[in-house]
Amino acid sequence: MENKNTYNELLYKSNPFHYTAPALLEAYGRLYGLTPKDSRKARVLELGSSFGGNIISQALYNPEAEFIGVDLTAEQVKKGNEVIEKIGLQNIKLIEKNILDINEDFGKFDYIIVHGVFSWVPDIVKEKIIKICNENLTEEGIAYISYNTYPGWKEADKIREMMLYANKYFPEVSQGDKVQRGKAFISIVAEQMKIYTDVAEKKGDFIKQIEGILNMQDYYVGHEQLENINDPMYLHEFVDMLRKENLQYISDVGLRLSIASVYNDSTIEKLQQLSQGDPVIKEQCLDYILDTKFRRALICKGSQAEKLNFSETFPNDILDSFLLTFKYTKEEVETLNEENVKAIMLHLIETPNKSFTIQDALKYWEENINTEDKNQEKTNEVLANLRKFVLNSMINAKIKFYCSENEMVPYEENQVYVPEIFRNYIRTLIVGEGAGIIGIGNSRNEIINDMNNVDVIVADILSEPKTEEEAIKELSKTNIYRTMQDGEGVQITANEYFPESIKKLEFLGYFAKK
């Protein structure tokens, strides 16, 4: 791919992205009526995998699954494989390969992930990516492709064009210098626009977009704004490409871009009139209304099309089967109108990282919420309200849903330990070969930013079960500093820090029982 050299020149940190996790893609497939492979035992291919940061964490938590990453950049593939070897993972490898050279002999995969690649490659590579999603996807497999989208990118195109113009006469400077020059240029433009009231009022959103880019990290701006290719397209154009390869568009990962039922009645009615039941037309119209800038498409084989449920009404047994996790704050739950649902959710939010099912929520109501009219009719009413609330929350990305999850062993003094593979993982990514280039992810592929070298020490101390007294005594040999708001480091005791570290390790699911 043509942008190979710039990826070497301006390092793009390889992070996990939760919305690409096979466990999530599996759940979306089941929501829409498909029967994808159990993600814990699947074969997964990522195109444009860089150092492997998006799939290394998944390989860590899913030892029975197999992960293959493909990238053209030799240095990143080599470094990523060194990190994988250091961690000790046996179910993942990165391959230096041109996407154009992949054919059916490369094998079949249950999930194919293409994140942050599609809009930045020539048309011939785009077409090949789509072809791979046909030829190398299992019959019931699911592919994920993200891409920049019109109409939302129309304004962003102007900013990109300004930054490219700022570097027009300096083709030989480094990518990092181009980013700084481009940022300086658009900063001046925004400042001057603000001087003139009529312009500032008319182009307020545009100015905010510029300010947003000025606050972004250089590696992201360099690849988003200054690559030779950044080629947004409309949803309908993307779907046309899929159809040429007999692929079927399912939905966007952002369900608000696919399911209209959460909008007001007028919007729903007009979308129905415009689309006449065609889900792609409906979503394209939503993009015009919402000025959509980015999409994360889910795709399956054309042979699966007749299984898909586009009715926006999903069977109760499917909703009830999902493991759910909260993204609500307590303040948001307090605003709920339905009192029984509010009471249930206020209880569940006390353990926000613990998953639950709709039936778990109903059971809590049956056993703990006192109402005078508690009978079967009332139970059915509460259950219906719960399902409605959960579905709306799923669409609005306030509840995440999965088909399965990793066992989370709680911390017990002198009863649990941290297995070697997890200790190797955080050590390698925090103080070892992967430090600064690969982000840490949890079992849901969410990026974790609060781990540090002291947590590595705590994990190593707990390589065997220990009493807290023993563990803290060992930890007290380490100088521990907490960075305050003013940037100053304040020393704290092992007694203070140990419980904090335990919470982190527990949340990550690192504990096991002997």
Short names for language-model regions:
Residues 51-64:
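Conserved SAM-binding loop of SAM-dependent methyltransferases across substrates and taxa
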Residues 145-171, 186-188, 192-198:
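Conserved class I S-adenosyl-L-methionine
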Residues 73:
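Conserved SAM/SAH-binding beta-strand->alpha-helix loop
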Residues 260-276, 280-295, 299-300, 332-514:
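Long, charge-rich, low-complexity alpha-helical segments
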Residues 103-112:
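A short acidic, Gly/Pro-enriched loop at the edge of an enzyme's catalytic core
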Residues 88-99:
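Conserved SAM-binding strand-loop segment of SAM-dependent methyltransferases
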Residues 127-139:
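A short glycine-rich, Lys/Arg-flanked "PGG" loop and its adjoining helix->strand segment in the class I
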Residues 13-42:
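Conserved alpha-helix/loop element of class I SAM-dependent methyltransferases that forms part
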